Amino acid sequence: MRRIDTEILVIGGGGTGVGIAWDAALRGFGVVLVEKRDLTHGTTGRFHGLLHSGGRYVVKDPQSAAECIAENRILRRTHTHCIEDTGGFFVVTPEDEGDYPDRFLAACRQIGVPCQEVPVAEALRREPLLNPRVSRVFEVPDGSVDGFLATHATAQAAVRAGAQVLTYHEVVGLLVEGSEGDRRVVGARVRDLACGEEVEVHAALTINAAGAWAGQIARLAGLTVQVIPGKGALLAMNHRIVNTVINRCRMPSDGDIIVPAHTVAVVGTTDRRVNDPEVFSVEPWEVRLLLEEADKLVPGITGARVVRAWAGVRPLYEEHQTGATRDTTRAFTLLDHRARDGVAGLLTIIGGKWTTFRLMAEKAVDKACEQLGARKPCTTATTPVPGAERGYYWLGHRLHEVEEHHLQGELVCECELVTRAMVENAVRANPALTLDDLRRDLRLGKGPCQGGFCTYRAAGIMHELACHATPSQAGQEGRRWEVERLECPADQAAGAGSAAPVCPPPSDLWNPNLLLRDFLQERWKGAMPVLWGDQMRQERFDELIYLSLMNADHLPDEGLCSPMTGFYGA
């Protein structure tokens, strides 16, 4: 069995895990991160994309609010290009009257969240679709963040600092030495899902940052970490109905936020306790509830087109919590299992929000320094990730580049303005096993057609690249995790001639029929809960192309399965 030796092993490829790898690598530690699927597959890739100002929690959870506003300011410097500076409104609807707005304003001032009351007329001028019956509006520095890009950019920064990032490597066991009362975790046994090979990763310290799966990882060492999985459903509208984050000015509840995100608006969210963190299905009642509540913020939204529904599972934690997940703190917890359970060599970090991932990573690596006997200061608060120099994201950047450089003929995905060069360079730069990986890299298939057209083109491009790859180009050695300008059509077109070699996976996972089947099945899961009106007609059209025109469900795939086939089909 192959063996890898390192100082710190990080389990989990979400925002927190990647942040830990970045922080630890910058402090000079040897770091290996393992993630059982692609980066951001879990909670980080399934939230509403809100960069919290802290306003949502100033009354109910002031500790979390204080952490959010402090990290908000830092991330605007370190991950600038991943953030759209939308600002945020907290609005008082006719159903929200009472003393909460005054308590909200006072709490913002006490905690240090910048907040000012703006005239309703001014708010309606900036957001014409906002409910005209709102009585008060407060402005806070919320923002919209691309969690996929931010996490991949952080991974790139970690790799440049010396870390090793292994996606599609699932932990199948923890390596534990010693007897009862004197046990130590010395690493993990992981399985490469692309080829089936098992690898032992030996480390002086293992950090469990698996989010909603952290309890499952802890059980591999015979430990109990009571994770409270709180499922939140979300909806993507087919266009940006608002350009400012809109919150209900009330205690956090279901369906009380709308976030502009790239070309769409995200309506969220619900909060229901589930037993299994893999439960991502969205129920019809959740869709109805979200639309009905959002209609109180933007009247008429119930008649707008919804292109997709999805859910994420929050990794909430309280040692003795038994009530509703809405009542669980959004602050994070760092567990030292040596002090807590008598098992050395293992830390678990859980809870928190995406906005606080950098702070969570800092505290985890501080504890790692303490246990490994090294005093190395954290520098992530002042170290921008690659791409931050471009400044804030703005919605029209892709259209501007496509038009300025006459790239219309190169478009693979018209909805999200993804060009052929972008697809080719994404495949070369990152360890993509599926088209779903390209969705996270490029927003491929995220528009109203949900991959109805671009899927075939992208699958063909990947197949073509694989056919022209030489044996010496295969493997993971060529993966560079270079993402800082991956979403810029003009840059990718200019760099296409000097692109890196293609590194297909070490098996037939790029079979085009397999790529097609898996990706369209993944898109179908998100479309099923919102099949009515225009989206029903769109999906019927996509189905006719796939089944009737292409006869794609009968194309031979040699019985192949990808690491994601079972998940997509569930």
Question: For the regions a protein language model found, what residue spans apply to each?
Answer:
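Flavin (FAD/FMN) cofactor-binding and adjacent substrate-gating region
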Residues: 92-162, 166-167, 173-184, 262, ...
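C-terminal catalytic lobe of FAD-dependent flavoproteins
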Residues: 147, 226-233, 239-241, 245, ...
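Short hydrophobic core segments
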Residues: 11, 201-211
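Dinucleotide-binding Rossmann-like beta1-alpha1 core, especially the glycine-rich loop
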Residues: 48-122, 126
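Glycine-rich FAD pyrophosphate-binding loop
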Residues: 25-45
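Beta1/beta-strand and adjacent pyrophosphate-binding region of the FAD-binding site
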Residues: 2-16
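Core beta-strand elements of the Rossmann-like FAD/NAD(P) dinucleotide-binding domain
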Residues: 4-6, 195-205
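Flavin (primarily FAD) binding-site architecture
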Residues: 208-222
